[in-house]
Amino acid sequence: MGYCQGVSQVAVVLLMFPKEKEAFLALAQLLTSKNLPDTVDGQLPMGPHSRASQVAPETTSSKVDRGVSTVCGKPKVVGKIYGGRDAAAGQWPWQASLLYWGSHLCGAVLIDSCWLVSTTHCFLNKSQAPKNYQVLLGNIQLYHQTQHTQKMSVHRIITHPDFEKLHPFGSDIAMLQLHLPMNFTSYIVPVCLPSRDMQLPSNVSCWITGWGMLTEDHKRGPVHTAVPSRLQAVCCSGCRGQRVGSRVGRFRSMIVHSEGQLRSLMPGDFHLGDSGGPLVCYLPSAWVLVGLASWGLDCRHPAYPSIFTRVTYFINWIDEIMRLTPLSDPALAPHTCSPPKPLRAAGLPGPCAALVLPQTWLLLPLTLRAPWQTL
């Protein structure tokens, strides 16, 4: 098995949300749309050193980028996907569980044989030593490993240096480098990274996945099996300065900035414990990564949107990290064959978070104050 190598270029989609009036019109159109794809297909080339590719901006066909566009974003599973129901093995092969001392902490997303992305806030008040973290892929059940499971040690954790410098949860993105490259199989595949200037169609089908809590009873811990939820994203402009709620403490009002953040407009089931997990959209050729679950209000306040890190904003940073980070030494990779401990939702702060109901968020009272939390 070889050592982990960097990638020269990474690109992602530019996705922003519309002004109030435009949002209402676009939302009405989306709610009545029935032309959303509900199947995925495609063949999977194998190989431990294959790299995730970019999706071409001008087309939704399988345009080759560096000859590897047939690798990423194409699960083996073919069939309908139902929101809120357990995922099937191989259905979301880039979904990873980030383990902290053997317990599920956050979601993460495989973007290359040696790299995953997650969110910086997952590491707040936690040890920064990579030896305390592992990633689990090829698994849809956290308590039960199969022959498809790969559990890998983390070599390096790189959090964004500007996290919360400009506004709360700003630059909420982190990268994880593995000691050894992940072997791509029918159950472990990287997600595609779209090009910077690609425009998503208005009826694109987008999904969020994770093991987060499905109820407000946070004592129950995360669910055992990965659960997908459907989300329809609006691709427009004008997300600046939109107030989505209030935050207790030193920040009395929470403002969503277009710089590096997305907000959800559609109902779904993104909950506590899903932080760092993927928001992916399906094009005719493959699934592409659009956002990372960052934060939201708890289930008692459904009128507020959940917030995602807009990955496209960090394209240069991601590219630089993957190009310039030193290679890991495979001889130093620790043994990682032990089964995971029973999960206890490590470090999860309080009750669950849910996506906003689309028909209510545009009429939010600006004076309402509600508790905030990470997802």
From Swiss-Prot:
Superkingdom field: Eukaryota
Region (Disordered): 41-60
Principal location: secreted
GO terms of biological process kind: proteolysis
Active site: 121, 172, 275
Any GO CC annotation of this UniProt entry: extracellular space
Subcellular location: Secreted
Signal peptide: 1-23
Positions of disulphide bridges: 106-122, 206-281
Keyword Methyltransferase found: no
InterPro entries named among the record's database cross-references: Peptidase_S1_PA (IPR009003), Peptidase_S1_PA_chymotrypsin (IPR043504), Peptidase_S1A (IPR001314), Trypsin_dom (IPR001254)
Molecular function per GO: serine-type endopeptidase activity
Keywords: Disulfide bond, Glycoprotein, Hydrolase, Protease, Secreted, Serine protease, Signal
Annotated glycosylation sites: 183, 203
Alphabetical list of Pfam families matching this protein: Trypsin
Ranges annotated as biased composition (Polar residues): 51-60
EC code(s) of this entry: 3.4.21.-
Peptidase S1 domain: residues covered: 81-323
Enzyme class: hydrolase
Recorded family membership: Belongs to the peptidase S1 family.
Alphabetical list of PANTHER family matching this protein: PROTEASE, SERINE 47, TRANSMEMBRANE PROTEASE SERINE
Protein name: Putative serine protease 47
Species in which this protein is naturally found: Homo sapiens
